[in-house]
Amino acid sequence: MSKKLIKSGLIVSTMTLLSRVLGLVRDVVIARLMGAEAAADVFFFANKIPNFLRRLFAEGAFAQAFIPVLTEVHAEQDEQKLKQFVAHVSGTLGAIVFVTALIGVIISPMITAMFGAGWFIDYLNDKPDGAKFELASAMLKITFPYIAFISLTGLSGAILNTLNKFAVAAFTPVLLNICIIACAYLLAPAMSEPAFALAWGVFIGGIVQLGFQLPFLFRAGLLVKPKWGWRDPGVVKVRTLMIPALFGVSVGQINLLLDTFIASFLVTGSISWLYYSDRLLEFPLGLFGIAIATVILPTLSRNHVGKDELGFSGNMDWAVRMVSLLGIPAAAGLGFLAEPILSVIFQRGAFTAETARMASYSLMAYAFGLLSFMLVKVLAPGYYSRQDTKTPVKIGIWCMAANMLFNLIFAIPYGYIGLAIATSLSATLNAALLYIGLSRQKVYVVSRLTLGFVARVMFSTCAMVAAILWMQQGVDFTGLVLRDKIVSLTLTILLAVAVFGGCLFSFGIRVRHFKSKAF
């Protein structure tokens, strides 16, 4: 089974890598166009709201609730029942998200006032930042319909993933990045406010992503006519699982939204600095954490349906090993090379050396929580695959409260950096509580072999950090030209990878070990 997981994981990771690279290209284009100016803050705000809902409907609670039920129905091998279930789910979800999108467009000023309260207060008091409120309200009308298209895309992708067709859904985000980049180059020069071109890129990207997946769904024989099915037994089961999961699986996104709310009261640039650092954090998180979580959920669901407790625990252990192997060194690399990485990728046009420096502080704080973010992604399926959504909700409530407390403690003295620290701490608490819950339910307890493996990874990472510090000592990175920056950063990363890999090799760890559940 682990060989199949590795193959599926590599497929998802490869497609995700392509998407993340294009995502970085997109962010470079945005940084060059707007840097960390007011318009950039507004676009990131207008894009964050529908993206928050996307994570709930398309990637978060819906997928966690839908895939286990779909796996159960698919296991019955009744094609007609399967098609009817898909028709009712797609019809019900489609109606809900299109109505949600319409309401969002109509009340966009209210949404902006709610989550951008700092701008709204300035608007009421005729202060300069009040213009951000008007711009954000107008831009949100364009970006909000994205939620409808991407939710149906998420449904299609979940169906294909359940059928072990992972490549299509993993490739789909590439199209959004292409659309945003194209609009930035083709539409922005013709607009008085270039940020609107990016908003239209999001809207068009949603349509293109859905259109891309439909032919693959047709080939799978599951492109059926949507029907309203609120009382369909399968839909009722998905609803029952999804309602609590809406909160439990999206704690991290809710925390980021709270960060945006607080950041609207901080100095101009705060939202942009958090955005750019979050984007770099999302690169390893998506490439490794989300990729592993994507392939593990259908597998765990099948283990649960087949009452394979040993297989369930073994696959969970494999997932924890993989995110530890990738997450620990990635977190250290991002933390100790934050400013050089931001400078090489983004520093051009309106994105200055000062912007890179400011964003590097929040990236360091986010990097501290990277492993926790990844662990949450792979531990949560341990609940949802067993159709247990209540426990993550209880954990989510505690983590939400903790994040608010951490924000109060750290945001006042440290500003936007404090928001990133609070998010990382709440993610760490989330991962710890998820694991404690699984162990108490006797579903999964980390094995001794995995603990030993993690210790070896941590030691290797310490050696890697020493190599990074040695390479970077005495280097005034901000004073280098771009070519020299690229050479310096590349050599540092190559040495770091070589030291990390060499240490693992000296500990007797080989590639073949990841093809089995125990080693």
What is each PLM-predicted segment?
Residues M1-F519:
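Membrane-embedded alpha-helical bundles of multi-pass transporters/translocases
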